[in-house]
């Protein structure tokens, strides 16, 4: 009886094994297997053709912006000397036109030229009619050239003078605070001191260094 059962189960086992083998063969020979095989061949061919230390071109290996090429120091020095010589010629001939300057005074920056008026919301310990020199000059410009400070220009290179022409007070400003049904009301009048300056002259050195 046991031999008959074993003989009957043996064909069933062989049939299942043959079915499983046929499924694995069909799966390996399908379109997915072909694509995987071609991808593996392509990867192996790329790895074989790329040299040692090859870095692919990406946004990290090669940035999208152009490479900055620094100028030659000798060429830059020669160009600087030419520009300075040309500016010296303009200054010596007085052909620079009307000068303007950017000065730092009373915690503000002012762009001024000759005969300009500056209204400063501050009180200065200077009497009317006195002449002062603005030492913090950030920039001086003309028609054809501009001298930039880093951050300030030297005192021996530029001179800006001004005169105090008026010391007065601002127009009264009323600051009113009120809360209804609270019996709260506060009134304050604000008056700030003011000083008016007139720019007299803007002068530059006769020759740059």
Swiss-Prot record:
The entry's keywords: Mitochondrion, Ribonucleoprotein, Ribosomal protein, Transit peptide
Superkingdom field: Eukaryota
Pfam family name, one: Ribosomal_L21p
GO molecular function, one term: structural constituent of ribosome
Compartment annotation: Mitochondrion
Region (Disordered): 46-70
One Gene Ontology cellular component annotation held by this UniProt entry: mitochondrial inner membrane
Residue pairs linked by disulfide bridges in the UniProt entry: none
Transit peptide: 1-50
Complexes and interactors: Component of the mitochondrial ribosome large subunit (39S) which comprises a 16S rRNA and about 50 distinct proteins.
Family: Belongs to the bacterial ribosomal protein bL21 family.
PANTHER family referenced in this protein's UniProt entry, alphabetically: 50S RIBOSOMAL PROTEIN L21, LARGE RIBOSOMAL SUBUNIT PROTEIN BL21M
Name assigned to this protein: Large ribosomal subunit protein bL21m
Biological classification of the source: Eukaryota, Metazoa, Chordata, Craniata, Vertebrata
């Amino acid at each position: 009886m046991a031999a008959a059962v074993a003989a009957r189960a043996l064909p069933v086992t062989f049939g299942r094994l043959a079915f499983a083998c046929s499924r694995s063969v069909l799966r390996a020979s399908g379109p997915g297997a072909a694509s995987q095989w071609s991808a593996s061949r392509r990867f192996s061919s790329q790895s074989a053709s790329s040299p040692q230390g090859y870095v692919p071109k990406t946004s990290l290996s090669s940035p999208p912006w152009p490479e900055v090429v620094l100028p030659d120091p000798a060429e830059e020095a020669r160009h600087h000397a030419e520009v300075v010589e040309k500016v010296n010629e303009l200054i010596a001939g007085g052909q620079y036109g009307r000068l303007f300057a950017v000065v730092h005074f009373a915690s503000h920056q002012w762009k001024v030229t000759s005969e300009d008026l500056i209204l400063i919301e501050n009180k200065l310990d200077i009497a009317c009619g006195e002449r002062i020199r603005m030492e913090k000059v950030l920039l001086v410009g003309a028609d054809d050239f501009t001298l930039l400070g880093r951050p300030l220009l030297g005192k021996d290179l530029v001179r800006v003078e001004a005169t105090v022409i008026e010391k007065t007070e601002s127009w009264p400003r009323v600051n009113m605070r009120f809360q209804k049904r609270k019996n709260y009301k506060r009134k304050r009048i604000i008056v700030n001191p003011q000083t008016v300056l007139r720019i007299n002259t803007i002068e530059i050195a006769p020759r740059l260094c």
